[in-house]
Amino acid sequence: MKCPFCGHSNTQVLDTRMSEDGDAVRRRRRCEACDRRFTTYERIELFFPAIVKKNGSRVDYARAKLKDSMRLALRKRPVSAEAIDEAITRIEEKLLALGEKEIPSSQVGELVMRELRKLDKIAYIRFASVYRSFEDVSEFSDVLAEVTAGSGKR
């Protein structure tokens, strides 16, 4: 591996360990030329399916975009950043498990709605109202009835 300080191509691995979450190998290295030390990480490269939008265009999957849309729905709701990240990870695991090269954005939207429903009913309704493009109050009422019936409250 090339030294980031002097560019020399010979480095020595001093220590190799698994990261805490087990998804990376951490290596401590020393440059044989300048004697400086640095750390490298080796991770699995995951390939998410391309997202096919309603207009037929294709975009790369972007975790940040998914996180932004979920955070918007969860704004001012009592849900931790950690819980949001865990939900996004579950969505990503489902996307990878599909084994497809492309998936429609509607499928991602449905996965997001399922996770939001588990996290916070209000956020679920907020997201559903935008995602499903509610045209009138009756559509809103239908989703409210569905959520309250599912939680045993009326």
Swiss-Prot record:
GO terms for molecular function: ATP binding; DNA binding; zinc ion binding. Keywords: ATP-binding, DNA-binding, Metal-binding, Nucleotide-binding, Repressor, Transcription, Transcription regulation, Zinc, Zinc-finger. Residues 49-139 form the ATP-cone domain. One of its GO terms (biological process) is negative regulation of DNA-templated transcription. Pfam families: ATP-cone (PF03477), Zn_ribbon_NrdR (PF22811). A zinc finger (unnamed) spans 3-34. Binds 1 zinc ion. It comes from the Bacteria. InterPro entries: ATP-cone_dom, NrdR-like_N, RNR_NrdR-like. Belongs to the NrdR family. PANTHER family: TRANSCRIPTIONAL REPRESSOR NRDR. Negatively regulates transcription of bacterial ribonucleotide reductase nrd genes and operons by binding to NrdR-boxes. This is Transcriptional repressor NrdR. It comes from Cupriavidus taiwanensis (strain DSM 17343 / BCRC 17206 / CCUG 44338 / CIP 107171 / LMG 19424 / R1) (Ralstonia taiwanensis (strain LMG 19424)). The lineage of its organism: Bacteria, Pseudomonadati, Pseudomonadota, Betaproteobacteria, Burkholderiales.
